[in-house]
Amino acid sequence: MTQEFEHLSVLLAETVAGLNIRPDGIYIDGTFGRGGHSRKVLEELGPNGRLIAIDRDPQAIAAAEQFKDDSRFQIVHGGFGQLADYVEDLGLKGQIDGVLLDFGVSSPQLDDAERGFSFLRDGPLDMRMDNSQGETAAQWLARAEIEDMAWVFKTYGEEKNSRHIARCIAADREKAPFLRTKDLADLIARITKNKERNKHPATRVFQAIRIYINSELEQIDQALEGALAVLAPEGRLSVISFHSLEDRMVKRFIRRNSQGESVPHGLPITEAEINKSRKLKAMGKAIKPSVEEVERNARARSSVLRIAERLPYEA
């Protein structure tokens, strides 16, 4: 029997409110998960509205069965980085009224030890979002060079001890391969001297491996550009990030597309001409969860929501 894990959608009301739902609009939930955000969007859509959800996790696709009788809903099995391709295949490019992206790992993924995402639960070192394809974390750790591991840990996990940890992994795998999450987490805890308060020593390394295995930052970049390409004028983009690497990408993307093209000083270009190149308008400042939400759901603590609106296309 399949074990069920509860998932609480983060910043639910704020994220959907940011989409400014129109009853007959067309919306994308690029990270379906267990359907919390999708359910809220469907509640606000009218009978002629439409929601296209995307997820590469087979368990998320199975969870989408809850909406099988709702003709306004459809699910696509794939990565959110390809959302523009899916929209183009449906003939809806430039007609999307809102795109929602939640970059967090869902609670069911973290809580299911068999998925291998958690350093707190012993399970196989997998970490693939789509566990039907691709290289597992264990396979990568078995073959990666010390320099490659150190680069991944530092770049994707901002781990200060990246090189030391990489060397220790390489030394230990000579005795036995790393096949279980507990083996890797225990090694990192054992060799880490300056431990951060209230943070497991393996947090950054596990994050880094997960990001690398799933090409998450590349997917995020493609998803943001894809959302910009498919949104209709005045369409909204609501994006939830969970760590600084993600949030910096989102912040810079919105800023870059809301400021217009930079031109060398002195060129005879008017403000109006520069404004034509602006594609987005930031909708207020970043939104963080309330104290009450964090008390209900500790995993919401690091979440950040940013909202932007698509400006009219250049004539």
From Swiss-Prot:
Q: Determine if Transferase is one of this entry's keywords.
A: yes
A cellular component annotation (GO) from this entry: cytoplasm
The protein's matches in InterPro entries, at most eight in alphabetical order, are given as:
RsmH (IPR002903), SAM-dep_MeTrfase_MraW_recog (IPR023397), SAM-dependent_MTases_sf (IPR029063)
Q: Which GO terms describe its molecular function?
A: rRNA (cytosine-N4-)-methyltransferase activity
Spell out the subcellular localization from the entry: Cytoplasm
Give GO terms for biological process: rRNA base methylation
Output the superkingdom of the source species.
Bacteria
The UniProt record gives the binding positions of S-adenosyl-L-methionine as: 35-37, 55, 80, 102, 109
Listed Gene3D superfamilies: Putative methyltransferase TM0872, insert domain, Vaccinia Virus protein VP39
Instruction: Indicate whether Ligase appears among the record's keywords.
Output: no
Family, according to the entry, reads as follows: Belongs to the methyltransferase superfamily. RsmH family.
Biological function: Specifically methylates the N4 position of cytidine in position 1402 (C1402) of 16S rRNA.
What name appears for this protein in its UniProt entry? Ribosomal RNA small subunit methyltransferase H
Q: What is the lineage of its organism?
A: Bacteria, Pseudomonadati, Pseudomonadota, Gammaproteobacteria, Alteromonadales
